Amino acid sequence: MANPKRRWSKARTGKRRSQWKLASPTLVSCPQCHVFKLPHRVCGECGYYDGKQVVKVEAK
């Protein structure tokens, strides 16, 4: 099996790892209840999607 010829420096390792980042989720406001939700998904608060009620949500 092949082995590394040289040790990678801390700078090289750090430069590579600097691109590892988490993307913050994109949130949009629901047009019905104005709660933030993920785009292209049914609103968890009111159950509406694309102007139609798709899911019946029980009152809390």
UniProtKB/Swiss-Prot annotation:
InterPro entries reported for this sequence: Ribosomal_bL32 (IPR002677), Ribosomal_bL32_bact (IPR044957), Ribosomal_zn-bd (IPR011332)
Record bears the keyword Phosphoprotein: no
Keyword terms: Ribonucleoprotein, Ribosomal protein
One GO MF term: structural constituent of ribosome
GO term, biological process aspect, one: translation
Family per similarity comment: Belongs to the bacterial ribosomal protein bL32 family.
PANTHER family assigned to the protein according to its UniProt record, in alphabetical order: 50S RIBOSOMAL PROTEIN L32 (PTHR35534), LARGE RIBOSOMAL SUBUNIT PROTEIN BL32 (PTHR35534:SF1)
Protein name, entry field: Large ribosomal subunit protein bL32
Organism the protein comes from: Ruminiclostridium cellulolyticum (strain ATCC 35319 / DSM 5812 / JCM 6584 / H10)
